[in-house]
Amino acid sequence: MRPLYSCNLATKDDIEMAGGVAPAHLEVNVGGYNTEQTIPIVKHQLVKVGRNDKECQLVLTNPSISSVHCVFWCVFFDEDSIPMFYVKDCSLNGTYLNGLLLKRDKTYLLKHCDVIELSQGSEENDIKKTRLVFMINDDLQSSLDPKLLDQMGFLREVDQWEITNRIVGNGTFGHVLITHNSKERDEDVCYHPENYAVKIIKLKPNKFDKEARILLRLDHPNIIKVYHTFCDRNNHLYIFQDLIPGGDLFSYLAKGDCLTSMSETESLLIVFQILQALNYLHDQDIVHRDLKLDNILLCTPEPCTRIVLADFGIAKDLNSNKERMHTVVGTPEYCAPEVGFRANRKAYQSFSRAATLEQRGYDSKCDLWSLGVITHIMLTGISPFYGDGSERSIIQNAKIGKLNFKLKQWDIVSDNAKSFVKDLLQTDVVKRLNSKQGLKHIWIAKHLSQLERLYYKKILCNNEGPKLESINSDWKRKLPKSVIISQAIPKKKKVLE
């Protein structure tokens, strides 16, 4: 008799990397009986469910199940953050969360004891049913505070937006919670409410946040999308935006206390997307000014995913007059030397924080320097000017701008990639590439056709773009050999008869 399912389980190394214990797992119920099999969900490793035994961790033989039916994953931003668990429907026949149909290709935040059904047969036809019960480790459940909204004085409803008490992020900026748009409800189909995010910031009285003002006018697939803003009587600003559930680039690269490199092809695709976003921003006379790994979000924690630029809290709108900026802002590790950070903090005492020590100021090319630092880290796992890790060391090294391509980490990196990094990390701003020149650099131009195929077909998942007419359905076979379409499946495999 053919087994109903098989499991490709997470390895011991995967679980140890997640802190020695899987933070959550799926309990598998196939054909109407509990298999007593659990599928661990560990940090930044996809758990795919479907019929494809080469790609899925839980392989089902039911013909009503799609090749890849749904995907689960976990995101940890850092040791102090609450782990987030997500499910995404990829099927033709539907995935149900607690009895409600999920929208295809949409991602939903999971909670303890959620029931996921991959097919909804009748009670008399249980053989067609596949149920997965999502269970969170007991030690993690207490991190969620169901009374958060009341404690913080947040509204529960703003126009058509319903704000939940489910946290997906918090920090000095404020809090990010899950919200639903009541206007999207379909009377004909009982869909699970789509998840969005609301960023809630405490403002000074009578001050509208410039981040919201900037984001409301932007519309680009690689920039966080904002739908609505509102300020309540307590001066809480609510920014309703897309939920980007794959974590940030920093946590994606983090392995323990270190950052790891990624393949050159994966780095190239991310750089291409960042350049698309920067080119759009700079054409709109907007400068991000805080581009770093933490502010680059992933839609899913896997190669070939869409990335999104976020956190425009210190972005600058130049108002089309091409003015230069003079404020010392940003993160020193990623900051261009002309911005004006000084290694000796006493030097700031005789100057206003609102004016750079370099009286000439700076322009949008400061974002390209930041991209150079990010690219250096992705290709090598090393921050180019980190030195001993102190702010003083970083600032001094950045002003010198010396790069060491003799490090062993550069051995497998192409000369074109090195040239790209070098051209972005020019201390002489005149010699540094701008966003348009970056897109024309040989590292990008040499692979432009392949990058566009990936960008429009895989990243945007649509048929837009001037060069798509020549793209065939077998685009995957035309990719560079180093492109990884899906995560490797652990070798350990268990089949239940």
From Swiss-Prot:
Occurrences of domain FHA (ranges): 47-102
Origin: domain of life: Eukaryota
KW Acyltransferase (keyword) present: no
BP term (GO), one: meiotic recombination checkpoint signaling
GO molecular function: ATP binding; protein kinase activity; protein serine kinase activity; protein serine/threonine kinase activity
Boundaries of every Protein kinase domain copy: 162-444
Entry EC no(s): 2.7.11.1
Residues that bind ATP: 168-176, 199
EC supergroup of this enzyme: transferase
Keywords (A to Z) from UniProt: ATP-binding, Kinase, Meiosis, Nucleotide-binding, Serine/threonine-protein kinase, Transferase
One GO location term (cellular component): nucleus
Catalytically driven reaction(s): L-seryl-[protein] + ATP = O-phospho-L-seryl-[protein] + ADP + H(+); L-threonyl-[protein] + ATP = O-phospho-L-threonyl-[protein] + ADP + H(+)
Record-annotated active site: 290 (proton acceptor)
Purpose of the protein: Probable protein kinase required for meiotic recombination.
Protein family per UniProt: Belongs to the protein kinase superfamily. CAMK Ser/Thr protein kinase family. CHEK2 subfamily.
PANTHER family the UniProt entry points to: SERINE/THREONINE-PROTEIN KINASE
Protein name: Meiosis-specific serine/threonine-protein kinase MEK1
UniProt organism field: Saccharomyces cerevisiae (strain ATCC 204508 / S288c) (Baker's yeast)
